[in-house]
């Protein structure tokens, strides 16, 4: 197992959750969410995060239907990942993210009740869960 740094994204039309993790430990930590306008992020904010954390790989969550089929937001998340690759020349992989938002809310609620359920916090923890699930899938 290598010690690559990996950045995870939870794509949304209003907010994009971000997390950073290390392959060596298989764990991630949520970073601040990036605001999006109808799914379009401020690319300068993403550029700053990439320069600060210098990840070796990006993982974008794919919001699939429960039966595994794609929906409109799935197509938009895939397009976001492709744009990350095109703009920043970073390797991008995709990860099924079904139920990560529900899991993120449950984790945050356990830690701090309703006050912990701020949108940016949920998105960041969702990105963390996507990232950790991707690493678990790779290295079990």
Curated annotation (Swiss-Prot):
Coiled coil: none
Keywords: Cytoplasm, Hydrolase, Nuclease, Ribosome biogenesis
Top-level taxonomic group: Bacteria
Localisation per UniProt entry: Cytoplasm
Regions that span the bilayer: none
GO biological process, one term: rRNA 5'-end processing
GO CC terms: cytosol
Primary localization: cytoplasm
Disulfides per UniProt: none
Pfam families (alphabetical): RuvX
E.C. number: 3.1.-.-
InterPro entries listed in its UniProt record: RNaseH-like_sf, YqgF, YqgF/RNaseH-like_dom, YqgF/RNaseH-like_dom_sf
Any one GO molecular-function label of the UniProt entry: nuclease activity
Protein purpose: Could be a nuclease involved in processing of the 5'-end of pre-16S rRNA.
Family of the protein in this entry: Belongs to the YqgF nuclease family.
Name of the molecule in the record: Putative pre-16S rRNA nuclease
Organism: Aeromonas hydrophila
Lineage: Bacteria, Pseudomonadati, Pseudomonadota, Gammaproteobacteria, Aeromonadales
């Amino acid at each position: 197992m290598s010690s690559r740094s990996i950045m995870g994204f939870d794509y949304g039309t209003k907010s994009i959750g971000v997390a950073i993790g290390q392959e060596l430990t298989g764990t991630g930590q949520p970073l601040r969410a990036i605001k999006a306008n109808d799914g379009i992020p401020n690319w300068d904010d993403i550029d700053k995060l990439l320069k600060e954390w210098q990840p070796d790989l990006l993982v974008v969550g794919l919001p699939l239907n429960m039966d595994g089929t794609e929906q409109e937001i799935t197509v938009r998340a895939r397009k976001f990942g492709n744009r990350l690759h095109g703009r920043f020349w970073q390797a991008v992989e995709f990860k099924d993210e079904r139920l990560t938002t529900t899991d993120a809310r449950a984790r945050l609620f356990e830690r701090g009740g309703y006050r912990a359920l701020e949108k940016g916090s949920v998105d960041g923890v969702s990105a963390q869960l996507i990232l950790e699930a991707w690493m678990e899938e790779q290295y079990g």
